[in-house]
Every structure is written in structure tokens, then in C-alpha cells.
Amino acid sequence: MAEGFAVNRQWIGPEEAEELLDFDIATQMNEEGPLNPGINLFRVPGITETEKQEYCNILQPKLQDLRNEIQEVKLEEGNAGKFRRARFLRYSDETILSLIHLFIGYCTYLCKRNKLGTLVHNIDIEAPQEECYSNRERGTTVNIKYSRRCCIGTTALYLLLLTGIIIYTQTTQAQVVWRLPPLVVPVEESEIIFWDCWAPEEPACQDFLGAMIYLKASTNISIQEGPTLGNWAREIWGTLFKKATRQCRRGRIWRRWNETITGPSGCANNTCYNISVIVPDYQCYLDRVDTWLQGKVNISLCLTGGKMLYNKDTKQLSYCTDPLQIPLINYTFGPNQTCMWNTSQIQDSDIPKCGWWNQIAYYNSCRWEQTDVKFHCQRTQSQPGTWLRTISSWKQKNRWEWRPDFESEKVRVSLQCNTTKNLTFAMRSSGDYGEVTGAWIEFGCHRNKSKLHSDARFRIRCRWNVGDNTSLIDTCGNDPNVSGANPVDCTMYANRMYNCSLQNGFTMKVDDLIMHFNMTKAVEMYNIAGNWSCTSDLPSTWGYMNCNCTNSSSTDSNKMACPKRQGILRNWYNPVAGLRQSLEKYQVVKQPDYLVVPREVMEYKPRRKRAAIHVMLALATVLSMAGAGTGATAIGMVTQYHQVLATHQETIEKITEALKVNNLRLVTLEHQVLVIGLKVEAIEKFLYTAFAMQELGCNQNQFFCKVPPELWQRYNMTINQTIWNHGNITLGEWYNQTKDLQQKFYEIIMDMEQNNVQGRKGLQQLQEWEDWVGWLGNIPRYLKGLLGGILGIGLGVLLLILCLPTLVDCIRNCISKVLGYTVIAMPEVEEEEIQPPMELRRNGRQCDMSEKEEE
């Protein structure tokens, strides 16, 4: 080797090549190297010097690279340790075998693992080994002994697991909760209801609610008394009033356009200039006053938030009321409405009083009378006076219009009205909280479209016989000697013309807020100049409250007596009381979110077979909501309701957006989207309920949910097991007897919503496995099989690709160890070479041969 280096230091001879290849093989046996690093060609038995020289010529580039690598890398004990990979594989096999022993229950192997040594056979010993076995050990190998222990331990482990599962299933039975049972119950008086209105072509009311008006169901169920929609009459009235006027705020731009004003000579000499025309939306005031406020619009009230209406007259369930005419301000004329005379018994201030007393005159015995009275008004205007050239402020056209200066003193304007019937008014009453004195009346008047005037409605106030002292109240009397009174005639006679005026404003009190509506500009926009006429358009079903007048027993001549036998109550109609009376027949009911199911129900066995869940559901449907008439069933109505909500894209987008904010992974939209009021409280409740239900393991298709007994017992929830009575009970009675449990179950949900300590403990004790695989319940059975097959095949192929080499090696080693053989692999040689024998030795020697003979 030294001589070769002396001659040519760049040439690598056979001796150095042999060492370099040993280094390469030792390096490849590291952890990062391949499983089979190969053999050293220079160590093949029988190789000649000529062949070594040929190998050196062929492998010279490779050998040069190895030499450079040795020179660059510092060889230390930690670098490229020989047989390190073999040791790693050995320890890996021991780890795998330990996991297998642990899985099959052979746990003692882990304890004895460190005590086991390594069996070494020295093949150079000349003296044969002697057998030394006891009678118990003779004929039994170590593999047979440990295989018996393995079988016994595995059997005991699985028997123990099976026994534990049986004991757990028999002793722990979860409480069953029925979600959304098919029944309706009255709401509590303290509950908050969410509602909205629907009216044709009214932007202030929700458009999509119109599809819900026709969702009705005939039913023969008996519902106990509860709150009606009339209980919320004042809140509904206040909201409708705000809806009617919220689009008419001062400052809103109705029309806007630019226009050029030219002089006599056109735009010469800079005589033209540009102006911007802005018209506020004052027209909205008159539209709302003449439609909404007077009750000319048919409005339906629809409940949201999962509530329904039960019509006591028609025995029907619905989501919306029938179309109602709901006046929003006090009127002399209105729909039929009851009243009370004895004011000491009136507990509600909104109920109208059936009369008026003034000094010794008592108007009582009031009754509502339908009337077809009409008012006819005629406006005339004198032509003398100046004419102004003004821009038409209500038409989006660049044109000029001549109109008389009706505000000038030279222009005579007359607005006179008459009535078709004699109207005697019994008393003075408040008129829109205004300071009106004397005899007066207000009504709405409609003007038809003509060549010079557009279609319009006006509110007209007629006042006559004001009296000498306007600071005193009107008495409708004729006696001037009455003290503290201003005698006037309160009768409006038929076919007599009275001087009237267009009402350009009114004042309303909503809750504690007094709002004044100034409609001066709105009246002017309707082109009131000129001659025109209008006729009242009171509904034919409206009437007034007519009262009888009686004198008291007092004979004081200085006090006013009855001027007339009968009189009409002016502004008698109270909108809140009228709305309450119209809504009294609609009882507010709801579908419960859940119903506690007694264990006796689940364990109930009829004569032939066990009552399954679908049998219970059918029985409950028949007992509770079976339709007696030809109308649709309530279940079908709820389904249609869900379809209506599903088509309302705006609602779905808003609720979905809210769900994204709260990061919910389950959305039970079909059953929980009953909350569509788009109110903050409703959406929060929807989110909380959806969150709690998903944590309880209830998805959108799961009507029966199991609550863990630990969570159930924490709240001391006990249930009467005798209420089932073999099915002889209605769902209404069932709900009433378990009503207290519903409240306790609601506490569980609230604990989950608020994430307090008890709620978190309850969530931790839920069945995690059901939460993870709960979504599988939504997949049909055939899809489950198909999906399972695909996943199984894919997983099997993946495991086979990844684990096949290790698996084959493990199986080979296990078989060899069980049989007691040690595999000795010799390097491969060429086919023409004589292959050395590869022997399998049993316990270090061949059968019936001594060690000398083997050697």
C-alpha cells in the first residue's frame, strides 16, 4: 500500500479501495442510510489480484470522492458509528413488540424487559453443550410458555372490558329530552313576543311576511287560557305609529334637480343663472295621515320568534292575523268598539269612557251605531289679485306654472262643508291634544283627480259657534245663565254649509313623547289653489258612539242641564283600546323547545311489540294536533313556514352572518330559524339555543336527545314516572305535569350559554364520541356503507404502502423467534461462482450432529 502511494499519490490501489469501501458501508449503516447498504467487492471470497485491479479502474472516480470525503470530515466516535443502524432497528423492533404485548394484555413483559439478557453462542467452543432441564421444563420451550401467558392475558383483558361495558350500560341511563314536540302551549305573560306587520305595497312592513298569511291549520285541540295578542296592544300601536311616520322626517330629500333660469334676452350679458331645486318629502305626511293614521290600510300582524296565534273563534292556528283596519289616532268615527261608563271600575286608561258628565247633565247608556254619514266640501277662490310666476315644486319637469297668490289679502278663499245627517255632539273632548274650543269636528276628505288638480286627501276641521268667551269649555247648551260655561250649539245640521279649514298640523302623544306634525308645506304641495271639491271616504262599516243624556236630581239652576236627549261622543275612538279589542280573540301560543320524556315512556311495551320512537311520535301527533276539519295539519303548516323562511334570503344572510361571528360549528337552521324577527334579543337566543343543543349532541335531524345522568342529577330533576299511564294522556297534560322540569332544563342550557363552572363540568361529562361522530347520523345508510368502504380501502392501501417492508420484516422475525431459528444471511455472488450454503440452525446446532461434525 505504501509503495502504491509513493509511485502515484492520485491512484487508489486495491488495499486503499478496500478500506474506503468499508468506510462507505459503515457510513451507510447509520440511521440515515438504506436498509441494505451492500457488500465490499474487494472482500468477495476467491477474488484475484487481476479482478481487484479491474475493480479499481472501474471504481476510481467513486474512490476519489470517498478519499476527499475522508479528508474533509473529521472522523470521531459520534460520526458514522458502525452498526448504529443495526442497533436502531433492534431497539425499534423491541418497541414494536412492547406495544403489541401491551395491546394484547401481556403487561408483565414490560416489567421483565430490562431483566432479559442476550443469548450468545460461541461457535469456537470444542466441548458440546449439555442439556440441563427440569421435569417441568422438559418438552416446553420459552415461546410456548409465553404464548400461553399471552392467550390467557388477552382473554382476561377483553372479558374485563366487556363486563365493564355491560355494567355501565345497565346502571347509567341518560335522560331523554324530546326536541320540538308537536304541540302548542300558551306563552307566559312575562315573555317577550316579536312581531312585524304586513300590508300590500307598504315598504314599512316586511314583504316576505305576506306568504305567511295563508299558513293556517285547522285543529281540534283544546288550549288552556293564556295571554292574547291584545295584551301587547299598546306596544303594537306605538310601533305602528312610528312605522307610519318614520319615513316622513323633516329634512329628507324627496326630489332634487338642477335648473337654469333665463332672462328676457336668454343668457346674453350673463342674465341666466343655475339653481338647485330641493323638495323635502312632505308628501309622506299626508299619505301616512290619510292611510295609516286613519286606519285605511289593511294591516296583518305576524308573529315571529317561534310564536303562533290561536284564533278562538275559528279554532285555527296561524302565524298572522286577518287583515285589520287599525286607526292610530283618536277619531269621532271608527270601527265597533266597546266602552265603559263606570269609571271607578276602569283599570285600563285606554278603555274609552261611555259618556261624559258636566254639572248636572249625564251622558250615559252609550252604544255604537253604524252610520253612512258623508261630508262634502267645496273650495272656492276669488280671481282678483296678483299672479306669481313660480316653479312647480312637485313635478320633476323644467317648466313654469302660473298660479294665483292665494296668500294675498286680495284673494278670497272659502272652504265650506256640509253633512248628510244631523250630528249632535254630547260633550267637549280632546282633539289631538290641541287647544280647540267651541263646536268642532275633524274628518278626512278625498279629492278626485282632475285636469287641474291631482288626486289627494286632506284632513279638514270644521268649527262653528265658538262663543263669546273662548277660554271656557263648550257646553252644547243654550242657557246663558249657566256659571262656568260658554253656551254654544254643538249640533251640525244636515245640508247646512259650515266654514272649515285645512288642518295643517296635529299633535300626537306616543308613550311619554308628544310629537307635533306640521303639514303646512305638504298641504301646499297638493296644489290647493283654485276651485275643487272633496268627499269624505269613511269606511261603510264605521260608526260613532251615541249616548243618552239624563239630568241628575239636583235642582241647581246655575248648572248646565241636558241640552239634547242624545249626543255623539267626539273623538271617542281610542286606537289602543280598539286594537286591543280586535286582538283579544288571538291567543299567543308557542311550540315548546323540548319536552322531558319519562323513562316509563321509553320502556313502555304494548301487547305485541315495543313502542318505537316513530310510534310515539305518531301517537303524540294524533293526541295533540290531528286536524278535525279539512284544513291542513299544524305539522304541515310548520313545514310550510320553514319553506317560507328558507326563501327569505335577507333573513338567512343576517342570521348566518351572526352565526359566523359566534363561530358555531353546527347550525340547526331548519328547526331554530323560527326566530326571524331580526331583533338582537331574538338572534342572541337563537345562537344560545343552537350552541347548547349542539353541545348536548342534538343535531337538526335528532328529535330525541340524551342528557347525561350526571348533568341531570346535578339539578335535582326528578320526574313522575306514572304520568304516562299506558299512553292515556295528551301531550298538553304531559307538558303541564313536567312544566317545572322544563324550567330546570332551561337552567342547564343557560349554564352552558354563560360558560359558568357547572355548565363547563356538564359539557366535560358529555359523550365526546357522540359529538365527534354525530354528523354521521345525517348520512343515509347506503352512503355510510359506500363511504366506509372507500375510506377502508384507501386506508388499507395507504397502510400497506407505508408499512409493508416493516411488516414483512416483523413477521419474519416473529416466526423465526417462535420456531427458535437464527437466520444467518451470506453475501450473494455471481451465478457461476459456488454459493456457500445458508443454514438454519436450531438452538445453535443441526439435528443429530455434534459441533465437531458441523464444523
From Swiss-Prot:
| Keyword hit for Disulfide bond | yes
One GO location term (cellular component): viral envelope
Instruction: Name the UniProt key words of this record, in alphabetical order.
Output: Cleavage on pair of basic residues, Coiled coil, Disulfide bond, Glycoprotein, Host cell membrane, Host membrane, Host-virus interaction, Membrane, Transmembrane, Transmembrane helix, Viral attachment to host cell, Viral envelope protein, Virion, Virus entry into host cell
Q: Which GO terms describe its molecular function?
A: structural molecule activity
User: Which residues are sugar-modified?
Assistant: 220, 258, 269, 274, 298, 330, 336, 342, 418, 422, 448, 469, 481, 499, 518, 531, 548, 716, 720, 736
Extracellular topology ranges: 1-784
Q: Which residues lie on this side of the membrane: Cytoplasmic?
A: 806-855
- From the UniProt entry, list the residue stretches annotated as the region Immunosuppression: 661-679
Q: What is the superkingdom listed in this entry's lineage? A: Viruses
Q: Where is this region: Disordered?
A: 835-855
Q: Which InterPro entries did the record assign?
A: Envelope_glycop_lentivirus, GP41-like
Protein known as: Envelope glycoprotein gp150
Transmembrane portions of the chain: 785-805
Q: Could you state one GO biological process linked to this protein?
A: symbiont entry into host cell
Q: Which sequence ranges form a coiled-coil region, renumbered to this chain?
A: 642-692, 735-771
Q: Which gene encodes it?
A: env
Site described as Cleavage, located at R610, A611
